[in-house]
A protein has these predicted regions:
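A polyanion-binding, active-site-adjacent surface
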Residues: 2-221
């Protein structure tokens, strides 16, 4: 089985599928050797239904959201130590939503802003009345996979249970309450799951656990 087919199969498994036809797995290999090429492809992406609802090009839509630190000006650090990945950008909130300032302050304690890179599993905002679908994940996740390969960060912080399971390609992992703070090593990169900011906003007691996860990341850096 080709690597691209295996990757797709693992994504479907993470979604809970037990059977996937060969036709579904027949999508072509997509591999970007440079970040500029990946961003250009993202800007013109029409692979899923979200392309019909976004305003402007995909990459511009990706840049327009209010986010913290270097992601606001969309500059890519020359030496990425920490890559932070959330499920999808919010149409109105920033990367950290109402907790943006608090997350920013916590990150200041573990890593220099110019060494942090922010990204999303799904590049376009998902309308509030629409659930994340397997199609969105399958079409968009390869962009992130290649982005990680290009940037080669020391640590990838995955925010939220679904995002963690897709990035780690393992739907059998425990829930985020048990999963957070664990360290998974692959290809010389440490992957650390933690809570999504929106989840923390609804469950304030998780904020301290999130900060503890960040301290664990500091040790890995």
């Amino acid at each position: 089985m080709q690597s691209s087919q295996l990757r797709r199969l693992l994504y479907y498994k993470a979604f809970g599928y037990r059977y996937v036809s060969a036709e579904i797995l027949s999508g072509g290999e997509r591999f970007f050797k440079a970040l500029d090429a990946l961003k250009s492809a993202t800007a013109e992406c029409n692979l899923c239904e979200l392309a019909k609802t976004r305003a402007g090009s995909g990459e511009q839509n990706f840049k327009n959201f209010k986010t913290i630190k270097n992601f606001k000006n969309s500059k890519t650090p020359a030496n990425v130590k920490l890559m932070i990945v959330a499920l999808a950008p919010g149409a109105n909130d920033g990367f950290g939503g109402s907790l943006e300032a608090e997350i920013e302050a916590a990150l200041d304690q573990i890593c220099a802003p110019e060494e942090i890179y922010f990204s999303f599993l799904i590049r376009c905002a998902v309308p509030q009345n629409r659930r994340v679908s397997s199609e969105m994940i399958l079409k968009c996740a390869p962009y992130l996979t290649d982005e990680i390969k290009i940037l080669k960060p020391k640590v990838v912080l995955c925010l939220g249970e679904l995002c963690c399971k897709i990035v780690l390609r393992n739907g059998d992992l425990a829930g985020i309450d048990a999963l957070h703070g664990s360290v998974f090593n692959e290809g010389g990169i440490s992957f650390v799951p933690s809570f999504d900011p929106a989840f923390i906003a609804q469950n304030p007691s998780k904020a301290e656990l999130f900060k503890e996860d960040l301290q664990k990341i500091k040790e890995l850096l």
